């Protein structure tokens, strides 16, 4: 049995960790360096760091904060936000990231994914897709969930995987921050089309949501923010619960 992963996510804006609902109404949560240190000691399998307004504001990612975060942790770090070129990949990796998440940059220039996979290996390239239902179709959104690209999400994700994305982080805008469970319909639709690891993001509210998630084929990791940041659920408590219920975890 493949060990499943629990991944906390730091959404960073203006140097602070924030959290909202459905990608809006962002509230200040904490200092990202302190929070990274906490998760490193709390049993997280990996950490995701998103500079969530870099693409929308058309600027480079905050590398100073990223460097400090990377220096504090000893678990794999995935970083995204404002990644538009191979130079951006270089910059992020030199700051200490293990994997680079690309979203709006790939939508603008799809060739970025095969080029990055060729240079760094597909295990380094994570496709982050912000997906929402529009008129019964799963659609890809850009610029932090602000812009409907009109692209079919399932087709886009499959193309990216076929062209070098080694992992998919699927962010459901519909369930983001709502805490009623992961978007299993969307996750199943993607898992049926690709054969790379899938990280489920958006909707976690309780430990049972993760158990239900991991009963679905093709889902390798559960990502959450608010419930961990607010300590409504600790990662150790969650992993012990999952392990007791037949889901193999690294304890």
Which residue ranges define each predicted feature?
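Short, acidic/polar
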Residues: 28-40, 84-90, 149-159, 207-210
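Catalytic cores of alpha/beta
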Residues: 73, 77-99, 185-221
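Conserved anion-binding
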Residues: 12-14, 18-19, 97-170, 174-175
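Structural preference for beta-strand elements that scaffold enzyme active sites
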Residues: 5-9, 46, 74-78, 99-101, ...
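Short beta->alpha connector loops at strand-helix junctions that form conserved
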Residues: 81, 102-105, 225
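N-terminal beta-alpha supersecondary unit
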Residues: 2, 16-60
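Conserved, mostly hydrophobic/aromatic
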Residues: 11, 39, 47, 79, ...
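Active-site-adjacent beta->alpha loops and helix N-cap segments on the catalytic face
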Residues: 2, 6, 54-70, 84-90, ...
């Amino acid at each position: 049995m493949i060990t499943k992963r629990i991944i906390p996510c730091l959404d960073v804006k203006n140097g602070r960790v924030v959290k909202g609902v459905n990608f809006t109404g962002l509230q200040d949560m904490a200092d990202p360096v302190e929070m990274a240190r906490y998760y490193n000691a709390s049993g997280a399998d990996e950490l995701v760091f998103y500079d969530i307004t870099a693409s929308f504001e058309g600027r480079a990612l905050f590398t100073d904060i990223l460097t400090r975060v990377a220096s504090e942790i000893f678990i794999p770090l995935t970083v995204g936000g404002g990644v538009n070129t191979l130079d951006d990949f270089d910059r992020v990796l030199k700051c200490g990231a293990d994997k680079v998440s690309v979203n709006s940059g790939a939508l603008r220039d799809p060739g970025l994914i095969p080029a990055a996979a060729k240079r760094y290996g597909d295990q380094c390239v994570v496709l982050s897709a912000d997906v929402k239902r529009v008129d019964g179709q799963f659609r890809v959104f850009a610029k932090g969930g602000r812009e409907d690209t009109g692209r079919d999400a399932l087709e886009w994700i499959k193309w990216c995987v076929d062209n070098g994305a080694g992992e998919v982080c699927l962010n459901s805008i519909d369930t983001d921050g709502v805490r009623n469970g992961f978007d299993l319909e969307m996750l199943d639709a993607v898992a049926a089309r690709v054969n790379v690891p899938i990280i489920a993001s958006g909707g976690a509210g309780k430990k049972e949501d993760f158990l239900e998630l991991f009963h679905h084929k093709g889902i390798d990791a559960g990502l959450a923010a608010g419930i961990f940041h607010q300590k409504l659920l600790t990662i150790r408590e969650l992993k012990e619960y999952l392990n007791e219920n037949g889901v193999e975890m690294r304890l």
